[in-house]
Amino acid sequence: MTEQTPAAPVVRRVDPRHRYEILVDGERAGLTAYRDRDDRRVFFHTEVDEAYAGQGLASILVEQALTDVRASGMRIVPVCPYVAKFLKKHEEFADITDPVTPEVLEWLDGQLKR
C-alpha cells in the first residue's frame, strides 16, 4: 500500500469576495481579505481554519498574495496584524508597502459597513 502525498497548497485571488484563499486538497483552509483603494490593496483580516493550524499556511497565503499585489503594480497597506507582522520579517516587500493612516482606517470602516 502506498501513502498518498497531500497536494501542495494552492492560493487563488477571488476578486468578487475581495480576498485570497488558500486551498488544501481542494478545500479552503484560509483566507486574507482586502479592499482596493486606488492603487493600494488594503489587507484587513487573515485567518486559517483551526483544522489546518501549524502548517505554515498563513505565511504561504500572505506571501503569494503580496507577490500578486506586486505583479499587478499595486501597493500594500497592512491593517491586518498578521500581514503587518509578516512584512516586518520580509523586507523584500518594503518598497511597495504604505503606512496605515487614520484616513485609511476611516475609509476601510466605511467600506466594511456597506
Spell out what each predicted region is.
Residues 36-44:
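A conserved beta-turn-beta hairpin within the catalytic core of GNAT-like acetyltransferases
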Residues 54-66:
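Conserved acetyl-CoA-binding loop-helix of GNAT-fold acetyltransferases
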Residues 23, 44-45:
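Beta-strand residues in well-ordered beta-sheet regions across diverse protein folds
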Residues 47-53:
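A short, internal acetyl-CoA/4′-phosphopantetheine-binding micro-motif in the GNAT/acyltransferase core
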